[in-house]
Amino acid sequence: MYLKDSKTVVIKIGSSLIINESKSIREKWLSDFALDIQNLQKLKKNVIIVSSGAIALGCKKLRLNKKNLKLDKSQAVASIGQIELMNLFKKNFNSKKINLSQILLTLEDTEQRRRAINAKRTFDNLFELNFVPIVNENDSIATSEIKYGDNDRLASRVAQILNADCLILLSDVDGLYTKNPKIHKDGKLIKEIKNIDAKIEQVASKSIGMHGTGGMKTKIDAAKICQLSGSYMAIANGLLERPIKNIYQKNNCTWFLPKISKLDARKKWIISSISPKGKLIVDDGAINALKKGKSLLAAGIINIEGKFSKGDHIKIIDRNLNEFARGLSSFNSNEISKIKGQHSNRINEILGYVTKSEVVHKDDMVEI
């Protein structure tokens, strides 16, 4: 039902849907999946496909074992495999008159505000031209320190910057179960999840498929981003024939419901950051002020963790080390180390130059 009401839909495909355990291409599956995308376009929906598989296909072409690859070698393999991946899509989608484009993203493209806006503009223009973007992480240049790490989180960030109505993660299971169904026969599918609590975290499977880099844990991480961005997210079985049609007709999947009905685009971007650069631990007085919609001042800061620059994403933590909010810092970490615990009227004196008094302005902050 959530899919039917969605205008912009992001669909993530795992490597295991492209290439099976015997390293054979799932040509029939791709052809059927193209019919699903064709149907969504007929319903006037904007569709984005986030597809894994570049490294797996590169390994297949070069006859390499993915598990033995080091980062620098995997980057080269990814550049080879990305061509193979796009050729597969082109072969199966062009016959159904589906126009395709390719977008390769790095972490900074969604984490830096200006680049995120530019990326959204590109996507919007592609929708106007009736093209379906195929998105992947730019593994050939991304380093381990600046990677999404898996395409589940990449897909959730793409959904977030596009203000997409829903994200569908196609996997090799029907959704999230009360127990791992591959081990426990009494495991039951959870149809809807409103809150990702400790129990949900616990039941999330940590199993990893032969070709993928993620598991159920990364899908839960993606769901958290979607919930805080106002988007619906589904985990569904992609191995079924016509998986999107199956969601439409049977809704046999797990839906994560958004926590936030509406946030402006700027605050969505702030709250959904994958990699905040630091933490500010604040006192009870500061927490009470923030609850009333006030800005964070230096006087309420007890401690600081991490090194960051002005404008970077940071977490605001209470005395019990619980995350209360996220925001954009008005100061760098060195400056905050000097002014923490001080009254605002002393900041200019301490730093030796005139600056603002708010460490995190209320307009640059979102409560978790």
Annotate each predicted stretch with a short phrase.
Residues 1-66, 71-99, 103-368:
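C-terminal catalytic "cap/lid" subdomain
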